[in-house]
Amino acid sequence: MRALEENGVADNTLVIFTSDNGPGYCGSPGGLRGRKGQSYEGGFRVPMIAHWPKEITAKSICSEPAMNIDLFPTLLSLAGVDLPEDRVIDGKNILSLLTSNGKRDPSDCLFFYHNKELEAVRMGKWKYIRDIDTMAWPIPLDKHWKSENSLEAPWLYNLELDPGESYNLRREHPDIVEAMEAIFQKWQKSMKENLGGWK
């Protein structure tokens, strides 16, 4: 930041500070459930700080969900570069979330993986976790980790009311479970058919 200021370009330079996942074996997920390697919010939800005085109001807060894969199309747009057309781009341009009170399209889905395995999907306030047993090492390295009861699967959470993912609502909302499972299956099928991301 000092170098940007000394060269007189700090006001019109976008600086982003974020992380790729929640804490691993140490640190705190800030009251959220889960850690790195799990599809709970504590494993994925991280802060992002964007500094761009010319375009972003100081101390403004955006609570809309986004993912690191959204940075690629956003930065290309800012640079005036078209997205490549020879491959599928999973991210969305989130410039309106950074510079104004924009909202993410409520039909947008966020997909959560552990290694190559699709584990969960989020759409709006709903989070659907279908499988969280993919990190079941023979000896868990994280003292906070515990195996989940597969009889409770799948898991459905209302993140607006339950950001700590404490109450599985699958029995109360079978229609939402069915809709989320359909989204899950469709996405998984598209990924297997197009493993390299090429059209």
Regions from the PLM with identified roles:
Residues 36, 40-41, 112-170:
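C-terminal, low-complexity/hydrophilic appendages and adjacent surface loops
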